[in-house]
Amino acid sequence: MDDDGIRVEDLLKLKLIVVGNQGTGKSCILNRFVNEAFEENYQATIGLDFQSKNITIHDQDVRLILYDTAGQEKFRSLIPMYIREAQIILLIYDISDKESFESMPKWIQEILDVKNSEAIFVLIGNKIDLESERKISYEEGKKFAEENNFIFQEVSAKTGKNFGTLFEVQIYEAVYNKFKSEFDKREKIGYEDDHANYDESNENTNKNNDNKVKLDANIINNNQSGKKKKRCC
């Protein structure tokens, strides 16, 4: 059992990884999603960090394993092994940093070098709270995402703006559609388990009712016997 009272072995497990240049707010995005919080002085990730979060998609429990990667060049060699296992890839750029957006093709190529395009790709423009410093327009980001068939959204890890839309609508729906057969299978198993428990409960109830009928019959017989004895006196 985990802290939510859910058996871990019953959860559908999916791996999500965030990639992008250093300083784009990758760690802050995960912290906002997992803990609904923002830390102004967040320490840069060294190498790779991970955490997990249990979510519910179409009434099914899912455990997301979240990998946070370092943006520094010296740690890039660590990333491919985790990219291979990821079902969801978040590509993060900073709307106030043109270089971070222009680095996206390089990041995508690094991903495709070790993994096919079957993963769910999500392009995220972070730091929309810095609107006055914007270098990449919404239209530029959206166009790039559409050209690559990616999900797209702009967010602010600082304020939490658009996080509900990004995760609970766009990403969750993409996950459900991508792994629908797995969701359907688990839903069927849950349905059969519920019916098995229902049948067992009914069977126990019927047994208890049978015993009650027999017990009531004995009480009636004893009462009748007692009445006869009373009349004899």
What does each of the following model-derived ranges do?
Residues M1-G23, S27, H58-D61, S117-L123, ...:
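Conserved P-loop small GTPase signature centered on TRAFAC-class small GTPases
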Residues V34-D61:
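Switch I (effector-binding) loop of TRAFAC-class P-loop GTPase G-domains
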Residues Q51, R76-M81:
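Conserved alpha-helical scaffold flanking the Walker A/P-loop in AAA+ ATPase domains
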Residues T56-H58, P80-E85, L112-S117:
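Conserved catalytic network of the ASCE P-loop NTPase/AAA+ motor domain
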Residues V62-S77:
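Switch II (G3) loop of P-loop NTPases
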Residues L66, I92, I124:
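Generic enzyme active-site microenvironment
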Residues A86-P105, K115-E118, D129-K135:
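Conserved Switch II/interswitch segment of TRAFAC-class P-loop GTPases
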